[in-house]
A protein has these predicted regions:
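Conserved structural elements of the adenylate-forming
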Residues: 36-41, 153-175, 235
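A short N-terminal helical cap/helix-turn-helix that marks the beginning
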Residues: 1-21
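Conserved AMP-binding/adenylation subdomain of ANL enzymes
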Residues: 164-178, 186-226
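Conserved AMP-binding A3 loop
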Residues: 31-33, 139-164
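A short helix-loop-beta submotif of the ANL/AMP-binding
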Residues: 56, 62-82, 86-90, 100, ...
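Conserved AMP-binding/adenylate-forming core of the ANL superfamily
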Residues: 21-64, 91-94
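Adenylate-forming
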Residues: 62, 110-112, 224-237
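Structural core segment of the AMP-binding/adenylate-forming
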Residues: 48-49, 69-72, 76-135
Length: 237
C-alpha cells in the first residue's frame, strides 16, 4: 500500500505488537508508538514556528533517536528535510543556508545565526501528540554537496515523500529488516538506508559514533542483516 512517509510510524504502530522497538541508539530505545507521538508533537511545534507544506527544514542534529523524530515531523508538516552536520563552521553553514533558505533550522550551532531556529535540546512541550494531516512533501529529501566546485549545492530528490509498504524497499532492504547504521546521518547513504529500514517496518540500530569493536558486538546482539560501511570503517574492523 502506498502511504505518506509521514504516516509510517503510525502505520507500523497500529500493526506491530505493542511496545515493538523501532530505533535504538545505545540504551535509548524508541517504540513505533513513541516515534509517532513524539513526531506529532514536533510537527505541531514546527508549524507553530512557521513551517508550511512545501518548505525546507534544515536538521543539524547528531545521530540519535531525536533525529528521526525530527525527520518524520518535517514530513508531517508537508515539508522536505535537509541534514547538515551540526558542527559545520559558521561561514560554511551560512553559505548552505543561503542556498537552501529553510523556514526552520533544528539544531546546529548558535553562531549559525539562523533567523528561525530551535536548539539541539529542544523539547516540544505542550503540543498534542494526536495524528497530523498535511499534504505530502513534493521532495522526500534535499541533501547538500560541495561537489567538484566546492560551492554548496542542494540536491533535490524528486521522489515525493511516499512509500510502498507491501513490497521490499530499495537496495534489497527487506520488510522487517534488522539494520545497523554506523555512519553520520548528515551523509546521504546513512540517511537513506536508515529511513528505508523504517519504511520497511524494520528495527534500526543506530550508532552515535562509529567504533569497530562495538559494531561487531551490535551485529551479533541484534542479528543484523544489513549494514553499510565505507572503506575506512572496513579497514578499522
Amino acid at each position: 500500500m502506498l502511504i505518506p512517509m509521514a504516516d509510517v510510524p503510525r502505520w507500523y504502530a497500529e500493526r506491530k505488537p505493542e511496545g515493538t522497538i523501532a530505533i535504538t541508539h545505545g540504551k535509548d530505545a524508541l517504540t513505533w508508538e513513541q516515534l509517532e507521538r513524539n513526531a506529532n508533537r514536533r510537527a505541531r511545534a514546527f508549524a507553530a514556528r512557521g513551517v508550511k507544506p512545501g518548505d525546507f527544514v534544515a536538521i543539524g542534529l547528531p545521530n540519535g533517536n531525536t533525529f528521526f523524530e525530527t525527520s518524520f515531523a518535517v514530513w508531517k508538516c508537508g515539508a522536505t528535510p535537509t541534514s547538515l552536520t551540526w558542527r559545520l563552521p559558521r561561514g560554511e553553514a551560512a553559505a548552505v543556508l543561503d542556498v537552501l533558505k529553510p523556514s526552520l533550522v533544528v539544531g546546529g550551532q548558535p553562531d549559525w545565526n539562523a533567523p528561525n531556529s530551535l536548539p539541539v535540546d529542544f523539547a516540544p512541550e505542550g503540543f498534542s501528540d494526536e495524528p497530523v494531516d498535511n499534504p505530502v512533501a513534493r521532495y522526500w529529501k534535499a541533501m547538500t554537496s560541495g561537489g567538484s566546485t566546492g560551492r554548496p549545492k542542494v540536491i533535490l530528490d524528486h521522489q515525493p515523500a511516499v512509500v510502498e509498504t507491501s513490497v521490499d524497499q530499495r537496495l534489497g532492504i527487506v520488510r522487517d529488516v534488522s539494520l545497523l547504521n554506523p555512519g553520520p546521518l548528515y551523509h546521504n547513504a546513512p540517511f537513506i538506508i536508515s529511513h528505508t529500514a523504517l519504511f520497511a517496518g524494520g528495527r534500526l540500530t543506530g550508532m552515535v559514533k562509529f567504533d569497530a569493536e562495538e559494531t561487531l558486538r551490535l551485529i551479533a546482539e541484534n542479528s543484523v542483516q544489513w549494514v553499510n560501511f565505507v572503506p575506512t570503517m572496513m579497514h578499522r574492523i
